[in-house]
Amino acid sequence: PDRTNGIVDVGNRAGDINSDDIESINVLKGAAATALYGARAKDGAIVITTKKGKKNSPVFVTVNSSTRFENVLKLPDFQNEYAQGSYGVYNVKMLNGWGPKISSVQDQQFTDYKGDKVTLKANPDNVKDFYETGMSYINNVSVAGGGEKADFRLSFTSTNQTGVVPGSDYNKYAFSVNAGMNFTNNFTGRISAQYIRSDSEGRPAQGANDSNLLIPLINGLPRTIDIHDIKQNWIDENGKQITLDPEGKSNNPYWIINKNKFTNNLDRMIGNITLTYKPIEGLTITNNAGTDFYTEGRRKVYAKGTVGALNGKFQTWNLYKRIINNDLMVSYEKTFANDYHFKAMIGHNLYQEEWKNENVQAQNLVVDELYTYT
Protein backbone atom coordinates (compact mmCIF):
# COMPACT_ATOMS: atom_id res chain seq x y z
CA PRO A 1 0.00 0.00 0.00
CA ASP A 2 1.02 3.62 -0.64
CA ARG A 3 2.00 5.18 2.68
CA THR A 4 3.03 8.57 1.34
CA ASN A 5 -0.24 10.24 0.36
CA GLY A 6 -0.61 12.51 3.36
CA ILE A 7 -3.13 15.32 3.09
CA VAL A 8 -1.71 18.84 3.23
CA ASP A 9 -3.92 21.58 4.68
CA VAL A 10 -3.80 24.56 2.31
CA GLY A 11 -6.55 26.48 4.10
CA ASN A 12 -9.58 27.87 2.29
CA ARG A 13 -10.25 30.82 0.05
CA ALA A 14 -11.54 32.98 2.90
CA GLY A 15 -7.90 33.31 3.94
CA ASP A 16 -7.19 35.19 0.70
CA ILE A 17 -9.18 38.21 1.86
CA ASN A 18 -6.97 41.00 3.12
CA SER A 19 -7.94 41.89 6.70
CA ASP A 20 -6.71 45.48 6.23
CA ASP A 21 -9.43 45.98 3.61
CA ILE A 22 -12.33 44.79 5.78
CA GLU A 23 -14.76 47.42 7.05
CA SER A 24 -17.29 45.07 8.68
CA ILE A 25 -18.45 41.45 8.84
CA ASN A 26 -22.13 40.57 9.22
CA VAL A 27 -23.81 37.20 9.57
CA LEU A 28 -27.20 36.76 7.92
CA LYS A 29 -29.46 33.85 8.79
CA GLY A 30 -32.73 32.42 7.60
CA ALA A 31 -35.03 34.13 5.12
CA ALA A 32 -33.02 37.35 5.02
CA ALA A 33 -29.98 35.55 3.65
CA THR A 34 -32.00 33.51 1.14
CA ALA A 35 -33.89 36.55 -0.12
CA LEU A 36 -30.68 38.44 -0.85
CA TYR A 37 -28.38 35.66 -2.02
CA GLY A 38 -30.65 32.85 -3.17
CA ALA A 39 -30.40 29.12 -2.59
CA ARG A 40 -26.66 29.26 -1.90
CA ALA A 41 -27.45 31.16 1.32
CA LYS A 42 -30.17 28.81 2.58
CA ASP A 43 -27.99 28.04 5.62
CA GLY A 44 -26.94 31.65 6.09
CA ALA A 45 -24.38 34.03 4.64
CA ILE A 46 -21.33 35.89 5.87
CA VAL A 47 -21.26 39.35 4.32
CA ILE A 48 -17.88 41.08 4.23
CA THR A 49 -17.94 44.80 3.48
CA THR A 50 -14.64 46.30 2.31
CA LYS A 51 -13.37 49.77 3.08
CA LYS A 52 -13.92 52.68 0.73
CA GLY A 53 -13.05 56.36 0.55
CA LYS A 54 -15.24 59.20 1.76
CA LYS A 55 -16.72 61.97 -0.34
CA ASN A 56 -15.55 65.52 0.30
CA SER A 57 -12.48 64.21 2.07
CA PRO A 58 -8.80 65.09 1.55
CA VAL A 59 -6.43 62.39 0.42
CA PHE A 60 -5.13 60.29 3.32
CA VAL A 61 -2.17 57.93 3.19
CA THR A 62 -2.21 55.24 5.88
CA VAL A 63 0.68 52.90 6.66
CA ASN A 64 0.38 49.91 8.99
CA SER A 65 3.13 47.47 9.91
CA SER A 66 3.17 44.58 12.35
CA THR A 67 5.53 41.80 13.39
CA ARG A 68 4.47 38.59 15.13
CA PHE A 69 6.44 35.82 16.76
CA GLU A 70 5.08 32.27 16.96
CA ASN A 71 6.14 29.25 18.98
CA VAL A 72 4.68 25.80 19.54
CA LEU A 73 2.36 26.10 22.53
CA LYS A 74 1.98 22.49 23.65
CA LEU A 75 3.74 19.19 23.01
CA PRO A 76 2.91 15.67 24.23
CA ASP A 77 4.47 14.46 27.45
CA PHE A 78 7.41 12.14 26.76
CA GLN A 79 9.10 9.61 29.00
CA ASN A 80 12.85 10.07 29.44
CA GLU A 81 13.57 7.01 31.53
CA TYR A 82 13.92 4.16 29.03
CA ALA A 83 16.00 3.69 25.88
CA GLN A 84 14.88 2.16 22.59
CA GLY A 85 14.41 -1.58 22.41
CA SER A 86 12.06 -4.14 23.94
CA TYR A 87 11.73 -6.22 27.09
CA GLY A 88 14.40 -4.10 28.75
CA VAL A 89 17.01 -4.89 26.08
CA TYR A 90 18.54 -2.22 23.83
CA ASN A 91 17.85 -2.70 20.12
CA VAL A 92 18.91 -0.05 17.60
CA LYS A 93 16.47 -1.52 15.06
CA MET A 94 13.49 -0.73 17.25
CA LEU A 95 12.32 2.85 17.74
CA ASN A 96 9.96 2.37 20.67
CA GLY A 97 10.96 3.03 24.26
CA TRP A 98 10.83 -0.39 25.89
CA GLY A 99 14.58 -0.85 26.20
CA PRO A 100 16.79 -0.71 29.29
CA LYS A 101 16.49 1.94 31.94
CA ILE A 102 18.88 4.66 30.83
CA SER A 103 20.23 5.28 34.33
CA SER A 104 21.19 1.61 34.69
CA VAL A 105 23.49 1.49 31.64
CA GLN A 106 25.47 4.71 32.03
CA ASP A 107 28.73 2.75 32.13
CA GLN A 108 28.07 0.93 28.85
CA GLN A 109 28.31 1.87 25.18
CA PHE A 110 25.82 0.98 22.46
CA THR A 111 25.67 1.26 18.68
CA ASP A 112 23.50 4.16 17.50
CA TYR A 113 21.61 4.68 14.21
CA LYS A 114 24.82 5.78 12.43
CA GLY A 115 26.81 2.80 13.63
CA ASP A 116 28.80 4.83 16.18
CA LYS A 117 29.46 3.71 19.75
CA VAL A 118 27.72 6.02 22.21
CA THR A 119 26.75 6.29 25.86
CA LEU A 120 22.99 6.48 26.27
CA LYS A 121 21.43 9.60 27.74
CA ALA A 122 17.98 11.13 27.56
CA ASN A 123 17.29 14.24 25.50
CA PRO A 124 14.16 15.79 27.05
CA ASP A 125 14.00 18.63 24.51
CA ASN A 126 14.71 16.69 21.34
CA VAL A 127 11.20 17.32 19.93
CA LYS A 128 10.91 20.87 21.25
CA ASP A 129 14.27 21.82 19.72
CA PHE A 130 13.14 20.64 16.28
CA TYR A 131 10.75 23.58 16.01
CA GLU A 132 11.82 27.15 15.35
CA THR A 133 10.36 30.53 16.21
CA GLY A 134 8.02 31.52 13.41
CA MET A 135 7.90 35.15 12.32
CA SER A 136 5.29 37.12 10.39
CA TYR A 137 5.72 40.54 8.82
CA ILE A 138 2.57 42.31 7.62
CA ASN A 139 2.84 45.68 5.88
CA ASN A 140 -0.01 47.73 4.42
CA VAL A 141 -0.24 51.07 2.67
CA SER A 142 -3.52 52.62 1.57
CA VAL A 143 -4.53 55.86 -0.14
CA ALA A 144 -8.10 57.13 0.21
CA GLY A 145 -10.05 60.29 -0.44
CA GLY A 146 -12.94 61.80 -2.33
CA GLY A 147 -14.55 64.84 -3.90
CA GLU A 148 -18.10 66.11 -4.20
CA LYS A 149 -19.28 63.29 -6.46
CA ALA A 150 -16.65 60.57 -6.19
CA ASP A 151 -14.57 58.62 -3.68
CA PHE A 152 -11.73 56.13 -3.95
CA ARG A 153 -9.44 53.86 -1.95
CA LEU A 154 -6.32 51.98 -3.07
CA SER A 155 -4.56 49.44 -0.88
CA PHE A 156 -1.52 47.15 -1.03
CA THR A 157 -0.62 44.57 1.62
CA SER A 158 2.32 42.18 1.84
CA THR A 159 2.41 39.24 4.25
CA ASN A 160 5.67 37.33 4.70
CA GLN A 161 5.83 34.46 7.14
CA THR A 162 8.31 31.79 8.20
CA GLY A 163 6.75 28.88 10.08
CA VAL A 164 7.64 26.95 13.22
CA VAL A 165 8.53 23.97 11.02
CA PRO A 166 12.03 24.52 9.59
CA GLY A 167 12.02 25.40 5.91
CA SER A 168 8.35 26.42 5.76
CA ASP A 169 7.21 29.83 4.57
CA TYR A 170 4.16 31.69 3.26
CA ASN A 171 3.98 34.89 1.23
CA LYS A 172 0.88 36.82 0.16
CA TYR A 173 0.50 40.07 -1.77
CA ALA A 174 -2.88 41.76 -2.11
CA PHE A 175 -3.86 44.81 -4.15
CA SER A 176 -7.35 46.33 -4.02
CA VAL A 177 -9.26 49.29 -5.42
CA ASN A 178 -12.69 50.60 -4.45
CA ALA A 179 -14.17 53.64 -6.20
CA GLY A 180 -17.62 55.20 -6.36
CA MET A 181 -19.22 57.90 -8.50
CA ASN A 182 -22.46 59.89 -8.48
CA PHE A 183 -23.09 60.38 -12.20
CA THR A 184 -26.34 62.26 -11.54
CA ASN A 185 -28.56 62.81 -8.53
CA ASN A 186 -30.37 59.54 -9.22
CA PHE A 187 -27.67 57.42 -10.90
CA THR A 188 -24.63 56.08 -9.01
CA GLY A 189 -21.98 53.47 -9.62
CA ARG A 190 -19.26 51.66 -7.71
CA ILE A 191 -16.44 49.40 -8.79
CA SER A 192 -14.23 47.24 -6.58
CA ALA A 193 -11.48 44.80 -7.44
CA GLN A 194 -8.94 42.70 -5.58
CA TYR A 195 -5.93 40.79 -6.86
CA ILE A 196 -4.23 38.27 -4.57
CA ARG A 197 -1.01 36.39 -5.19
CA SER A 198 0.21 33.86 -2.64
CA ASP A 199 2.77 31.08 -2.47
CA SER A 200 4.01 28.72 0.20
CA GLU A 201 6.63 26.04 0.68
CA GLY A 202 7.09 23.30 3.24
CA ARG A 203 3.53 22.89 4.56
CA PRO A 204 3.55 19.66 6.60
CA ALA A 205 1.40 16.69 5.63
CA GLN A 206 -1.12 15.13 7.98
CA GLY A 207 -2.23 11.60 8.83
CA ALA A 208 -0.51 8.37 9.81
CA ASN A 209 1.77 8.07 6.80
CA ASP A 210 5.42 8.42 5.87
CA SER A 211 5.05 11.94 4.44
CA ASN A 212 3.97 13.32 7.83
CA LEU A 213 7.12 14.48 9.62
CA LEU A 214 5.40 14.06 13.00
CA ILE A 215 5.49 10.28 12.54
CA PRO A 216 9.30 10.02 12.82
CA LEU A 217 9.53 13.05 15.08
CA ILE A 218 7.02 12.08 17.77
CA ASN A 219 6.31 8.38 17.21
CA GLY A 220 9.69 7.30 15.90
CA LEU A 221 12.39 9.38 17.59
CA PRO A 222 13.98 7.51 20.52
CA ARG A 223 14.65 9.63 23.58
CA THR A 224 18.34 8.75 23.38
CA ILE A 225 18.81 10.32 19.93
CA ASP A 226 19.75 14.00 20.02
CA ILE A 227 17.73 16.08 17.54
CA HIS A 228 20.80 18.25 16.90
CA ASP A 229 22.71 15.13 15.85
CA ILE A 230 20.17 14.00 13.25
CA LYS A 231 19.94 17.59 11.98
CA GLN A 232 23.61 17.27 11.01
CA ASN A 233 23.31 13.64 9.87
CA TRP A 234 20.24 13.27 7.66
CA ILE A 235 22.11 12.69 4.38
CA ASP A 236 25.39 10.89 3.65
CA GLU A 237 28.21 11.81 1.27
CA ASN A 238 26.47 9.91 -1.56
CA GLY A 239 23.23 11.84 -1.17
CA LYS A 240 21.38 8.96 0.47
CA GLN A 241 19.11 9.36 3.45
CA ILE A 242 20.40 8.48 6.93
CA THR A 243 17.28 6.97 8.47
CA LEU A 244 16.56 6.74 12.20
CA ASP A 245 17.24 3.00 12.20
CA PRO A 246 19.73 0.83 10.26
CA GLU A 247 16.93 -1.06 8.49
CA GLY A 248 15.49 2.13 6.99
CA LYS A 249 11.98 1.84 8.41
CA SER A 250 11.57 5.47 9.47
CA ASN A 251 12.36 8.66 7.57
CA ASN A 252 14.66 11.21 9.11
CA PRO A 253 12.46 14.30 9.75
CA TYR A 254 15.18 16.52 8.26
CA TRP A 255 15.09 14.46 5.08
CA ILE A 256 11.35 15.15 4.83
CA ILE A 257 11.63 18.92 5.28
CA ASN A 258 14.64 19.27 2.99
CA LYS A 259 13.84 16.79 0.22
CA ASN A 260 10.10 16.13 0.24
CA LYS A 261 8.64 19.61 -0.01
CA PHE A 262 5.06 20.59 -0.75
CA THR A 263 4.72 23.86 -2.67
CA ASN A 264 1.72 25.78 -3.92
CA ASN A 265 0.95 29.11 -5.57
CA LEU A 266 -2.29 30.97 -6.16
CA ASP A 267 -3.51 33.84 -8.33
CA ARG A 268 -6.99 35.18 -7.58
CA MET A 269 -9.06 38.05 -8.95
CA ILE A 270 -12.30 39.37 -7.45
CA GLY A 271 -14.29 42.14 -9.11
CA ASN A 272 -17.69 43.82 -8.70
CA ILE A 273 -19.56 46.61 -10.49
CA THR A 274 -22.72 48.02 -8.91
CA LEU A 275 -25.06 50.46 -10.66
CA THR A 276 -28.03 52.05 -8.89
CA TYR A 277 -30.76 54.04 -10.60
CA LYS A 278 -33.70 55.83 -8.93
CA PRO A 279 -35.98 57.05 -11.75
CA ILE A 280 -38.79 58.17 -9.43
CA GLU A 281 -39.22 58.60 -5.72
CA GLY A 282 -39.42 55.24 -3.95
CA LEU A 283 -38.29 53.14 -6.93
CA THR A 284 -34.75 51.75 -6.87
CA ILE A 285 -33.15 49.60 -9.56
CA THR A 286 -29.82 48.01 -8.65
CA ASN A 287 -27.63 45.72 -10.72
CA ASN A 288 -24.57 44.09 -9.21
CA ALA A 289 -22.26 42.15 -11.55
CA GLY A 290 -19.31 40.27 -10.13
CA THR A 291 -16.71 37.67 -10.90
CA ASP A 292 -14.33 35.64 -8.77
CA PHE A 293 -11.75 33.36 -10.33
CA TYR A 294 -8.48 31.80 -9.32
CA THR A 295 -5.81 29.41 -10.55
CA GLU A 296 -3.74 27.36 -8.15
CA GLY A 297 -0.81 25.02 -8.63
CA ARG A 298 0.29 22.45 -6.06
CA ARG A 299 3.22 20.03 -6.09
CA LYS A 300 4.39 17.35 -3.67
CA VAL A 301 7.73 15.62 -4.28
CA TYR A 302 9.38 12.53 -2.77
CA ALA A 303 13.09 12.16 -3.42
CA LYS A 304 14.62 8.78 -4.17
CA GLY A 305 15.42 7.00 -0.94
CA THR A 306 12.29 8.14 0.89
CA VAL A 307 10.75 5.43 3.05
CA GLY A 308 7.48 4.56 1.31
CA ALA A 309 8.70 5.85 -2.07
CA LEU A 310 12.20 4.44 -2.47
CA ASN A 311 12.30 5.09 -6.23
CA GLY A 312 10.98 8.61 -5.87
CA LYS A 313 7.75 10.15 -7.12
CA PHE A 314 5.93 13.44 -7.41
CA GLN A 315 2.38 14.65 -7.81
CA THR A 316 0.94 17.89 -9.18
CA TRP A 317 -2.46 19.54 -9.04
CA ASN A 318 -3.65 22.37 -11.29
CA LEU A 319 -6.89 23.91 -10.11
CA TYR A 320 -9.09 26.51 -11.74
CA LYS A 321 -12.38 28.00 -10.54
CA ARG A 322 -14.47 30.80 -11.97
CA ILE A 323 -17.71 32.28 -10.65
CA ILE A 324 -19.84 34.81 -12.50
CA ASN A 325 -22.73 36.31 -10.60
CA ASN A 326 -25.26 38.99 -11.53
CA ASP A 327 -28.05 40.28 -9.28
CA LEU A 328 -30.77 42.57 -10.57
CA MET A 329 -33.02 43.99 -7.84
CA VAL A 330 -36.04 46.27 -8.27
CA SER A 331 -37.68 47.63 -5.13
CA TYR A 332 -40.48 50.07 -4.47
CA GLU A 333 -41.24 51.69 -1.16
CA LYS A 334 -44.02 54.16 -0.27
CA THR A 335 -45.82 55.41 2.82
CA PHE A 336 -49.53 56.29 2.60
CA ALA A 337 -51.21 58.74 4.95
CA ASN A 338 -48.37 58.33 7.45
CA ASP A 339 -49.96 55.08 8.62
CA TYR A 340 -49.39 52.52 5.90
CA HIS A 341 -46.03 51.46 4.57
CA PHE A 342 -45.78 49.52 1.34
CA LYS A 343 -42.63 47.73 0.21
CA ALA A 344 -42.18 45.37 -2.72
CA MET A 345 -39.13 43.72 -4.20
CA ILE A 346 -38.46 41.61 -7.24
CA GLY A 347 -35.15 40.28 -8.45
CA HIS A 348 -33.27 38.10 -10.88
CA ASN A 349 -30.04 36.17 -10.33
CA LEU A 350 -27.64 34.72 -12.86
CA TYR A 351 -25.02 32.40 -11.38
CA GLN A 352 -22.42 30.45 -13.31
CA GLU A 353 -19.63 28.34 -11.86
CA GLU A 354 -16.82 26.52 -13.65
CA TRP A 355 -14.39 24.19 -11.92
CA LYS A 356 -11.38 22.25 -13.23
CA ASN A 357 -8.93 20.00 -11.39
CA GLU A 358 -6.02 18.31 -13.14
CA ASN A 359 -4.12 15.78 -11.02
CA VAL A 360 -1.05 13.98 -12.39
CA GLN A 361 1.33 11.60 -10.61
CA ALA A 362 4.65 10.07 -11.66
CA GLN A 363 6.52 7.23 -9.92
CA ASN A 364 9.85 5.40 -10.26
CA LEU A 365 11.86 8.43 -11.30
CA VAL A 366 14.68 7.86 -13.78
CA VAL A 367 16.56 11.00 -12.73
CA ASP A 368 16.49 11.89 -9.05
CA GLU A 369 14.93 15.27 -8.26
CA LEU A 370 13.90 15.92 -11.87
CA TYR A 371 10.24 16.64 -11.25
CA THR A 372 8.87 17.18 -14.76
CA TYR A 373 6.60 15.08 -16.98
CA THR A 374 8.49 15.67 -20.21
Give the location of each predicted region:
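Short acidic/polar hinge/loop motifs at secondary-structure boundaries
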Residues: P1-K29
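Outer-membrane beta-barrel channels and translocator barrels
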Residues: S19, S136, G147-E148, T184, ...
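Residue-level signature of outer-membrane beta-barrel architecture
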Residues: T50, G145-G147, S158, M181, ...
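Soluble periplasmic/extracytoplasmic beta-strand elements of cell-envelope proteins
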Residues: S24-L28, A45-T49, T62-N64, R190, ...
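Surface-exposed loop/interface segments of Gram-negative outer-membrane beta-barrel transport/assembly proteins
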Residues: N56-A122, G163-Y170, A174-R268, N288-T374
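Short beta-strands and strand-coil junctions in structured, solvent-facing domains, enriched
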Residues: D2, A31-L36, G53-N56, F69-V72, ...
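N-terminal periplasmic accessory domains that precede
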Residues: A35, A41-S65, N139-V141
